[in-house]
From Swiss-Prot:
Gene of this entry: tpx
Keywords carried by this UniProt record: Antioxidant, Disulfide bond, Oxidoreductase, Peroxidase, Redox-active center
TM segment ranges: none
Gene3D superfamilies listed in its UniProt record: Glutaredoxin
Protein name: Thiol peroxidase
Disulfide bond positions: 58-92
Catalytic function, reaction form: a hydroperoxide + [thioredoxin]-dithiol = an alcohol + [thioredoxin]-disulfide + H2O
Molecular-function annotations in GO: thioredoxin peroxidase activity
Pfam families in alphabetical order: Redoxin
Domain Thioredoxin: 16-162
Residues of the active site: 58
EC number(s) reported in the record: 1.11.1.24
Subunit structure: Homodimer.
Organism: Streptococcus pneumoniae serotype 4 (strain ATCC BAA-334 / TIGR4)
Length: 163
C-alpha cells in the first residue's frame, strides 16, 4: 500500500516492471517546449519522479541524482513533477543546477496516468525512479511505498552505473 502524509492513496493504471519498455511521453520543459522519450534516443536515462520540487525530499532526490549521475557517459537524468515549468526553472536557478533537465506533467497528467504515478486524491505524482537502457527497456524501477520517504539512492545509482 502506498501512503502520502500517512494516508493510503490510489492510482490509475498498472505499474511498470523491470523488462518492460518505457512508455513514450510528452512533457513540458522549463522553456515551455515539449520533450518526449524519443528526444533522448540512444542515451541511458534515469527518470527521477517527485511530487513537488519545492519539498525537502524532492529537492534532495533531484540534487543527488544530478550530482552523482549526470556526469556518467551517455546518460541523462530527467526529473519529472507536476510543478509548473516556471517553478522548476526557479528551483534550478536557486539551487545552482542550471543544467538539470526538468520536465513537467502539469498539462494533462498523461505521464502520471501512463506510469501509474498519478495520485488520484492529490493530482500529484508519486515518488519513483526508473533506470532505462539505451533501448528504453526498464532495468531498474522503484515505486516508493511511503511518498514522504527517499528512494533507495544506492540501488538506483548502482543500476545506472551498471549499464
Amino acid at each position: 500500500m502506498v501512503t502520502f502524509l500517512g494516508n493510503p492513496v490510489s492510482f490509475t493504471g498498472k505499474q511498470l516492471q523491470v523488462g518492460d519498455k518505457a512508455l513514450d511521453f510528452s512533457l513540458t520543459t522549463t522553456d515551455l517546449s515539449k520533450k518526449s522519450l524519443a528526444d533522448f534516443d540512444g542515451k541511458k536515462k534515469v527518470l527521477s519522479v517527485v511530487p513537488s520540487i519545492d519539498t525537502g525530499i524532492c529537492s534532495t532526490q533531484t540534487r543527488r541524482f544530478n550530482e552523482e549521475l549526470a556526469g556518467l557517459d551517455n546518460t541523462v537524468v530527467l526529473t519529472v513533477s507536476m510543478d509548473l515549468p516556471f517553478a522548476q526553472k526557479r528551483w534550478c536557478g536557486a539551487e545552482g543546477l542550471d543544467n538539470a533537465i526538468m520536465l513537467s506533467d502539469y498539462f494533462d497528467h498523461s505521464f502520471g496516468r501512463d506510469y501509474a504515478l498519478l495520485i488520484n486524491e492529490w493530482h500529484l505524482l508519486a515518488r519513483a525512479v526508473f533506470v532505462l537502457d539505451t533501448d528504453n527497456t526498464i532495468r531498474y524501477v522503484e515505486y516508493v511505498d511511503n511518498i514522504n520517504s527517499e528512494p533507495n539512492f544506492e540501488a538506483a545509482i548502482a543500476a545506472a552505473k551498471a549499464l
